[in-house]
Amino acid sequence: MAIKLGIVALLEARPGKEAALADLLRSAQALAAQEPATVVWYAFQSGPRSFGIFDAFNDEAGRTAHLEGRIAAALLGRADELLASPPDIRKVDLLAVK
């Protein structure tokens, strides 16, 4: 089955919470590893306070399960503490995959 769906989540840390957000994202890797429908999962930092997650799925059921799963719950459960603004979560269609 081809990987055709993804999620891009862009996160802006509150000042002074950059390390805590990075730690949360690192710890989420173990949760992503337990999701068989999440075929690709990356957490990244793109600036001093800018972070994100990119993940990919074979089908909508996998993407929905991920959005309703433990990583989303962990992130949203600490959003007020760690994030300067609500997360920018975008569903994307993958046009080409290597």
Q: What residues fall within each predicted segment?
A:
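Active-site-proximal flexible loops/turns
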Residues: 19, 49, 62, 66
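Glycine-rich beta-strand-turn "strand-cap" elements at beta-sheet edges
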Residues: 1-6, 10-12, 39-49, 74-98
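Short coil/turn motifs at secondary-structure junctions
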Residues: 14-16, 46, 58-60
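An amphipathic, aromatic/His-enriched active-site/gating alpha helix that lines ligand/cofactor pockets
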Residues: 27-40, 56-90
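Short, surface-exposed ligand-recognition loops at beta-strand->loop->(often short) alpha-helix junctions
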Residues: 10-22
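N-proximal accessory regions
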Residues: 3-4, 22, 59-62, 97-98
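Residue-level detection of beta-strand scaffold positions
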Residues: 8, 25, 54-56
